């Protein structure tokens, strides 16, 4: 899927943060960073590629702030916290403590949803996938028309 990983030492990662080279980043554990380099994204965009990110809410807000209306931000949320609890408990893979941590994080993340362009409620997976696809298609058609208009006006 065109995913490339670059492994940097914690010191080099911190230096690149200080130099403003990251579009978004997060220190997920002490000295364990993940992030997206601006230069890599720009190379992909210049090559005519569409770039899709699966990032946390802060990363999503940072990307949207950087690219403005050249980016589409989608927030996918559960129908409710109670439904999320039910789903997590139904998996039978996490302890009650881990489930509570995930629910607390979900509540925190939900507070960011108004900052996104589109909120999709994942009540039914197939419906949510179809709605997401339609939102993306609509956004890309608007972007394509905008590029055409810019070309016409530049002549």
Predicted features along the sequence, with ranges:
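Residue-level signature of catalytic and energy-coupling elements of molecular machines
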Residues: 13, 52, 106, 120
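NTP-dependent small-molecule kinase module
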Residues: 90-94, 108-155
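Conserved phosphate-donor/acceptor-positioning beta-strand/loop module used by diverse small-molecule
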Residues: 51-56, 66-90
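Short glycine-/small-residue-rich Rossmann-like dinucleotide-binding loops
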Residues: 56-57, 124
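Conserved catalytic network of the ASCE P-loop NTPase/AAA+ motor domain
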Residues: 43-47, 65-69, 111-113
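Hydrophobic/aromatic beta-strand patches that form the interior of the parallel beta-sheet core
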Residues: 6, 72-74, 118-120
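Glycine-rich S-adenosyl-L-methionine
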Residues: 96-107
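ATP-dependent small-molecule kinase phosphotransfer cores
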Residues: 1-51, 58-61
């Amino acid at each position: 899927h065109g995913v490339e990983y670059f492994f940097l030492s914690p010191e080099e990662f911190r230096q690149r943060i200080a130099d403003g080279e990251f579009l978004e980043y997060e220190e997920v554990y002490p000295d364990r960073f993940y992030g997206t380099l601006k230069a890599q994204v720009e190379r992909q965009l210049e090559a005519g590629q569409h770039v899709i990110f699966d990032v946390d809410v802060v990363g999503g807000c940072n990307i949207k702030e950087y690219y403005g209306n050249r980016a589409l931000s989608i927030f996918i949320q559960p129908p409710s916290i109670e439904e999320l609890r039910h789903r997590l408990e139904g998996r039978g893979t996490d302890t009650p403590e881990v489930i509570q941590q995930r629910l607390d994080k979900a509540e925190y993340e939900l507070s960011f949803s108004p900052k996104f362009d589109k909120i999709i409620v994942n009540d039914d997976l197939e419906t949510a996938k179809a709605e997401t696809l339609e939102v993306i298609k609509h956004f890309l058609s608007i972007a394509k028309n905008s590029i055409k208009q810019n070309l016409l006006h530049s002549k």
